[in-house]
Amino acid sequence: MPTHVALLRGINLRPHKRVAMPALRALVEGLGHADVATYIASGNVVFTAGTAESTLADDLEKAIADELGVTCRVVTLSREELARVVADNPYPDEPDPKRVHAIFLTGTAGQAAQKRLTEVQDKLGEKVGRDEARILGRTLYLHTPDGFGRSELAKVLSRPGGPAEGTARNWATVTKLLAMCEPSGTVGS
């Protein structure tokens, strides 16, 4: 069975969207998946899929809403897709993994997302500072050399309903999740 990663958007940030990781692991196992492991409490799940890949995100969203009472978007990636995201990082020279983020987009990015990104960057003008962003496939890469919390671009891109609909993870989390997908990783623990 292929290994996948599920990324939940916006959980455990506010009191009304709390999800306990043991409950999330049990839910994913209850959907017929195996080798389920979570990483930190921000909604990162690694598992081997027991059902069709095309329905993973929708099935997880529905089960989380029905069983845990939390409505959230879910982005799923195969191990191969996540490996491609890591390989395609346009900012490999940044030594601090917390200065590079991947925003995993829901759906396909395409020209419309690139156009929205350009519009946001143009609107912010000098407020963008040294920040950079690029879309490759279904991933928006965000480089914030002065810090994510200080980035005007990050604030706009991370806003629900903003130009980058998806869920963000810093590079340390992205690479840890890929390591968890490997045969010698911690899947199943």
Short names for language-model regions:
Residues 2-189:
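Surface-exposed, charge/polar-rich loops and edge strands
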